[in-house]
Amino acid sequence: MFEGYPVDTANTAGDQAVTNYTINFGPQHPAAHGVLRMVMELDGEIIERVDPHVGLLHRGTEKLIEYKTYLQALPYFDRLDYCSPLGMEHSYVLAIEKLLDLEVPARAQYLRTMFAELTRICNHMLNIGSHVMDVGAMTPNLWVFELREDCLNFFERASGARMHSAYFRPGGVHQDVPEKLLVDIGEWVETRLPKLFGDAMSLVIDNRIFKQRNVDIATVSKEDALAWGFSGPMIRGSGIAWDLRKSQPYDAYAAMEFDIPVGTRGDCYDRFMVRVEEVYQSAKIIKQCLRDMPTGPIASLDRKVVPPKRGEMKQSMESLIHHFKLYTEGFHVPAGEVYVATESPKGEFGVYLVSDGTNKPYRCKIRPTAFSHLQAMDMMSKGHMLADTTAIIGAIDVVFGECDR
């Protein structure tokens, strides 16, 4: 057939002639958990290089905050990591209180701690459910979302809003919670949460397929985790028991007893299991908060920062004027700078606040959790299959409102 036609063996399409090719993962990919674009270089189905492109959800939050009073800037934090809004508010209000040298009443500290842990459970339900669904299991996601819905209902009963609650305020919390809500949270933590969550996890934890998709995927050593600036479940999954609630306790965490779950292999499965165990530890903290919850005021008595009560405004003209001035002009914060980090559900969330003595922040630098985790995508993905990308991103737990700011 080829008689008389010389065959150029050097350029024959074969194994030698196949070159690496580049694909775009996202920014519309359902497993990207937001607007993540990754330019991936593949050798067949093996990942050779990953170049994450972030910033597609950048809204200029840090600059917008400079044009708002300290209280008006608070709702911006709800909209950073919108899966765990109270975790974002926490760092910001603590930073303001540190600059003001403001004392927060014990009841407010316990309420904050309790709702911060409810937020952690709420966040982990979303991550665990979507991670499991990304690798092919549907049922557990539907079950854990029922628990997430319960958490959102608790937020609504406390603040009036399911997600963007703006419940933590400089000096304490916005309003006290009904006694019935505390009773319901106590019953939920004792009965519904362990039952439903235990049932959902029984389908996943020892599942052969789930383990094959996650064990030994994106292994990160202790040294690498430190070098890349990991925090939260990412660094604990690599075997380092670093938790700001223990090492630098804030609010009521110093009085709480809980364990820090850590992984042994530093792979996707360990990071998943750290979050599963954190749900049980959060439940333990919530029980302690409910047991030891003191009575008393829910906000500081410093009237230069905290507005008067609604009842006072209906009887006193001075209180009404005071309220109006606080919400229009805001309060003045002494000049200085402060960095406050809290253990948000995804890792260390920090706020660096610079005050020039006016009623608006001079500068507010936000230290997101996912930014330092995403920069390690290339290191974690190299040598794995394309299909493993979904498991790796799922185990990072990234939300782009917070990452891109």
Curated annotation (Swiss-Prot):
Gene3D superfamilies: Cytochrome-c3 Hydrogenase, chain B. Keywords: Cell inner membrane, Cell membrane, Membrane, NAD, Quinone, Translocase, Transport, Ubiquinone. InterPro entries: NADH_Q_OxRdtase_suD, NADH_UbQ_OxRdtase_49kDa_CS, NDH1_su_D/H, NiFe-Hase_large. It is found in: Cell inner membrane. The keyword Magnesium does not apply. It catalyses: a quinone + NADH + 5 H(+)(in) = a quinol + NAD(+) + 4 H(+)(out). Its EC number is 7.1.1.-. GO terms for molecular function: NAD binding; NADH:ubiquinone reductase (non-electrogenic) activity; quinone binding. It is a peripheral membrane protein. Belongs to the complex I 49 kDa subunit family. HAMAP family: NDH1_NuoD. This is NADH-quinone oxidoreductase subunit D. It comes from Sphingopyxis alaskensis (strain DSM 13593 / LMG 18877 / RB2256) (Sphingomonas alaskensis).
